[in-house]
Amino acid sequence: MTTLAMLLTLADSRLPTGAHVHSGGVEEAITAGLVTNLSSLEAFLKRRIRSHGLVTASIAAAVQRGDLAPDGADRETDARTPSPAARDASRSQGRGLVRLARAIWPEADWDALGAKPHLAVAAGRVGALAGLTPEHLALQLVYTTMTGSATAAQRLLALDPTDVAVLTFQLSELCTTTAAEAAIGLADLSDPLLDTLAQHHAERERPLFAS
């Protein structure tokens, strides 16, 4: 498989990694009245790309380059994820990615990542095995950070799929520039609003999405 084909495959929302059950906080944002239409969804997605997307992609790129060992990357992710609920969501998605990766690269030492690695840690190892550049790996993570929340909002708000697709096209340049920044070095930030939404979501009864 070529590098481009590998990149497109990893960005495919149909991959059986469990990512489809996570809304990236947009369900709670909708419940709180912060996201109500396409315009407010755009603002939410921009915020998520510039914070969670940037941080996750930067740690994954560092793992891919070999600048961070898995245990160090795990600690760096925890330090940038104050919300326990957000950490749990990250580890759930990381475990799902490793489950798939074991089937694709069975010869790799996946046990070194631990039982429930953060998504960034698992993605960094996958990116290295797939032969992706740090820039391409970062772009894949930033892009799926955006599209996961966009798709969830489309379902929850019954938005026109075409309108949401147009919005994701419009945000593609932001994804590209954010990925380029992430590939340079570790991003050191968090977003209190997104952390609060994640925690409230975990404490709410019967949410539709896992996060």
UniProtKB/Swiss-Prot annotation:
GO cellular component annotations of the record: cytoplasm
The molecular function terms of the Gene Ontology recorded here are: nickel cation binding
* Keyword line: Chaperone, Cytoplasm, Nickel insertion
- What is the protein's quaternary organization? UreD, UreF and UreG form a complex that acts as a GTP-hydrolysis-dependent molecular chaperone, activating the urease apoprotein by helping to assemble the nickel containing metallocenter of UreC. The UreE protein probably delivers the nickel.
The record's section on PANTHER family has: UREASE ACCESSORY PROTEIN F (PTHR33620:SF1)
Protein family membership = Belongs to the UreF family.
Q: What is this protein called?
A: Urease accessory protein UreF
